[in-house]
């Protein structure tokens, strides 16, 4: 029994051994099996039965190891086991056996069980002599495994189409955690990540304390979600409490991250967000070597005393940070400048110094002929060496930057009533923030750089574009009257108020009628639970100057002037006949603006004619408001379909122009044209998305005021700084796209006739307008649907009035029809 106890540890090791080496056998095995020697040709004598004697090389422990017995066997069993191995061994005593004549090979458990057991004992002894792996080694292996899992999740995570602008995630180098001058290791090389992995695992550890505290409503009400930021400034309610509770956890985590400056920014994706939120856009460190474009073109190495600079920002993991709009790793920009950005005055004056850090920079690079402008997305962000950057400004005002652009490039306004060459003679007599027919056009006076406009300009979605076709068989059609138009705030007289108008909405809520406004105010007074929904506003539009400098204004004006002169008199006559409905401001009116013009005076049957019962007046007013919202949604859907048709027409005209370019230009120039028109849509979408989110945060800051929750305000300021860094990256990208367009336009001016060149200019202007209108329509439709769903949910939880019946024609999708009053 003692032998069985001592050999228990060797059982699993011996049974798990698949191939054993004869050289590791003990001397007892050599003496007991000396007949296996090649020098001995005599057959081995049979080993007698041991009986009650215990052989030195055969005991109960060995028998248990070989045959897997868990308890001592009987005497008969021992006899049978001692005879079976001998017979097996005798069978191998033949001199012709390869096991004997050749070199020692792997042992077989069935053929030589005792020899197998002895070898297992030697193997177990050798394993026992090896020291166990220390805990530090196991921890390092676990950290490497976790790092590999994070890289797999990062590379296979969901990405929006608007953000996939360059290299895939598996090719983006990681930000260095220690020295910014060291080259970035590839994210796919797991051999050299031993130093970085411990730092990366610290980020999830910090957020572990706050895990599970976020409610579903709090996750959805992020700062970048359209239509939800209007709730931030209100005190009380579950939304404000959740936000304050969420930020208290994030503030603690952010304080811990501030102590370790080498941590990576943790980015998460939200599948419930329409466009996903912003993220930090610091300049990722990239080696100054050769880079390869998406199309396969390889660029030359960076020369001179230029180096790359990395910006690392620690962000709480539970904070709702999305993947960056223009990730620095894929930022394909040349320069980096620091701007303060557009925000309310009190927002920047009171923002804490520790909310964020940015690397100020500096180098403004001119378009270089050595690198093709088609690869604008592929050019690395470079900053000069410290000795070269001394004495340069470190900060630039955003408004000053916009004013410089406006002075340099100028702005134009085109309409059907006035030809384009008459634009310098117009003057502004109304405030640039005044709304006309429910929409507003904002023009920036370039003669007063110090002027600040607190009104937030927006993009008009009331109009659409109808670009002219460019084919070889028929001449170019005159540009439509709704492509470019003067601002409504401009009248003839002054040359300072000129603007390239893309179409804009007023940022303030425009009620369709006085009856609608009175109905909303009355319901907010009668039912405070609906005040938050009724007081909300649709998402703001991007600022006006966001697209300034992207297109050459003067060149577009000169190219389109002949066509506008030809159609000037016809358009002016049409406007004199009262065809103001064809004006761009009224071409794409939202249902709110249409109702406002149609219902400028309340109808008797709508305002005073309907006398609801006193006991059910609140419910009847909700029904009436639901009917109005449903009608507005129907009008917006109709305009959305018409805008889709306009976009399809733009695609057709672009194809006709591409066919003309393919016949007149070389294949390389044709490829340049195709890539530019494809990238133009992505760049415009990114600029509009970034601008609208920046305005949304500014509105939330202005609404919150100085008496709001400090944690809430600090969180908004942190979000604002992230957006400002993204805005700086977007400005640099816009400058590169503008240089790329200039190079392409020079080729087209040399190769294409005048009518095709005019068509190209019209396509550029109309594409920006179509995208801005689509974004505005989608946002307003989503906003009205939220209001309609809230009112419908409130109506479904109240008993029906006997004077209310169902209206089959007015009902939301997948729901029962709304109630309508019996008049």
Curated annotation (Swiss-Prot):
The modification N-acetylmethionine is found at residue 1. One of its GO terms (molecular function) is actin filament binding. GO terms for biological process: actin filament bundle assembly; cell morphogenesis. Residues 145-233 form the ASD1 domain. Residues 517-796 form the ASD2 domain. The modification Phosphoserine is found at residues 103, 133, 137, 166, 190, 224, 385. Coiled coil: none annotated. One of its GO terms (cellular component) is microtubule. Its main location: cytoplasm. It is found in: Cytoplasm, Cytoskeleton. Keywords: Acetylation, Actin-binding, Cytoplasm, Cytoskeleton, Microtubule, Phosphoprotein. Gene3D superfamilies: 6.10.250.3120. Residues 1-55, 72-110, 124-159, 181-200, 270-303, 349-375, 420-503, 566-620 are annotated as: Disordered. The modification Phosphothreonine is found at residue 383. Residues 28-50, 72-85, 444-468, 489-503, 586-620 have a biased composition (Polar residues). The keyword Nucleotidyltransferase does not apply. Belongs to the shroom family. The ASD1 domain mediates F-actin binding. Interacts with F-actin. May be involved in the assembly of microtubule arrays during cell elongation. This is Protein Shroom1. The gene is Shroom1.
């Amino acid at each position: 029994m003692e032998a069985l106890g001592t050999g228990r540890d060797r059982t699993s090791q011996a049974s798990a051994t698949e191939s054993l080496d004869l050289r590791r056998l003990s001397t007892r095995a050599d003496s007991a099996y000396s007949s296996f020697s090649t020098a001995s040709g005599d057959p081995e004598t049979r080993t007698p039965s041991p009986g009650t004697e215990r052989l030195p090389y055969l005991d109960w422990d060995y028998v248990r190891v070989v045959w897997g017995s868990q308890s001592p066997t009987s005497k008969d069993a021992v006899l049978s086991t001692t005879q079976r191995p001998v017979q097996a061994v005798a069978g191998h005593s033949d001199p012709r056996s390869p096991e004997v004549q050749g070199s020692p090979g792997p042992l077989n458990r069935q053929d030589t069980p005792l020899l197998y057991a002895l070898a297992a004992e030697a193997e177990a002894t050798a394993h026992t002599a090896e020291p166990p792996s220390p805990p530090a080694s196991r921890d390092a292996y676990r950290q490497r495994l976790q790092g590999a899992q994070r890289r797999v999740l990062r590379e296979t995570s969901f990405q929006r189409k608007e953000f996939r602008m360059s290299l895939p995630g598996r090719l983006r180098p990681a930000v260095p955690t220690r020295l910014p001058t060291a080259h970035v290791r590839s994210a796919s090389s797991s051999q050299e990540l031993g130093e970085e992995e411990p730092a990366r695992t610290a980020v999830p550890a910090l957020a572990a304390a706050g895990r599970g505290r976020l409610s579903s409503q709090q996750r959805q009400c992020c700062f970048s979600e359209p239509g939800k930021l209007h709730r931030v400034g209100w005190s009380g309610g579950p939304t404000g409490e959740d936000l304050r509770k969420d930020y208290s956890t994030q503030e603690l985590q952010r304080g811990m991250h501030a102590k370790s400056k080498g941590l990576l920014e943790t980015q998460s994706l939200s599948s419930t967000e329409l466009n996903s939120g912003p993220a930090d856009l610091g300049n990722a460190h990239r080696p100054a070597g050769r880079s390869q474009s998406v199309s396969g073109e390889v660029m030359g190495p960076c020369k001179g005393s230029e180096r790359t600079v990395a910006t690392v920002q620690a962000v709480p993991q539970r904070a709702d940070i999305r993947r960056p709009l223009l990730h620095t790793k894929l930022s394909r920009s040349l320069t980096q400048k620091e701007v303060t950005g557009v925000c309310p005055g009190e927002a920047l004056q009171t923002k804490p110094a520790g909310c964020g850090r940015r690397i100020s920079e500096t180098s403004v690079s001119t378009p270089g002929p050595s690198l093709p402008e088609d690869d604008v997305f592929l050019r690395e962000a470079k900053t000069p060496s410290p000795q070269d950057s001394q004495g340069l400004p470190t900060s630039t005002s955003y408004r000053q930057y916009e004013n410089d652009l406006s002075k340099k490039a100028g702005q134009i306004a085109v309409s059907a009533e006035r030809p384009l060459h008459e634009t310098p003679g117009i003057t502004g007599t109304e405030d640039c923030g005044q709304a006309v027919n429910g929409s507003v056009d904002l023009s920036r006076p370039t003669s007063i750089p110090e002027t600040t406009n607190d009104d937030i300009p927006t993009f008009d979605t009331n109009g659409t574009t109808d670009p002219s076709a460019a084919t070889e068989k028929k001449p170019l059609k005159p540009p439509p009257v709704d492509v470019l138009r003067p601002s409504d705030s401009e009248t003839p007289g002054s040359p300072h108020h000129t603007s390239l108008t893309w179409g804009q909405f007023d940022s303030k809520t425009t009620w369709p009628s006085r009856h609608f406004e009175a109905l909303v105010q009355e319901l907010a007074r009668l039912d405070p639970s609906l005040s938050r929904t009724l007081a909300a506003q649709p998402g703001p539009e991007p600022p006006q100057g966001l697209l300034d400098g992207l297109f050459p204004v003067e060149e577009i004006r000169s190219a389109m002037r002949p066509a506008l002169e030809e159609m000037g008199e016809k358009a002016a006559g049409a406007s004199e006949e009262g065809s103001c409905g064809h004006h761009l401001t009224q071409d794409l009116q939202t249902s709110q603006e249409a109702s406002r013009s149609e219902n400028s005076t309340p109808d008797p049957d709508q305002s005073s004619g309907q006398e609801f019962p006193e006991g059910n007046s609140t419910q009847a007013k909700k029904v009436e408001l639901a009917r109005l919202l449903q009608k507005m949604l129907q009008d917006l859907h109709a305009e959305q379909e018409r805008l889709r048709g306009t976009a399809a027409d733009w695609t057709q005209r672009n194809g006709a122009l591409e066919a003309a370019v393919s016949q007149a230009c070389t294949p390389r120039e044709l490829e340049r044209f195709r890539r530019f028109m494809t990238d133009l849509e992505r760049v415009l979408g990114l600029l509009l998305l970034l601008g609208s989110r920046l305005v949304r945060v500014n509105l939330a800051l202005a609404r919150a005021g100085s008496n709001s929750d400090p944690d809430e305000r600090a969180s908004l300021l942190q979000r604002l700084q992230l957006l400002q860094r993204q805005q700086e990256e977007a400005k640099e990208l816009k400058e590169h796209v503008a240089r790329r367009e200039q190079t392409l336009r020079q080729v087209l001016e040399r190769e294409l006739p005048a009518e095709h060149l005019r068509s190209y200019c019209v396509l550029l202007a109309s594409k920006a307008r179509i995208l801005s209108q689509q974004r505005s329509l989608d946002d307003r439709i989503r906003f009205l649907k939220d209001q309609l769903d809230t009112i419908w949910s409130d109506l479904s939880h109240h008993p029906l009035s006997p004077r209310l019946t169902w209206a089959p024609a007015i009902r939301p999708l997948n729901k029962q029809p709304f109630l309508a009053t019996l008049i």
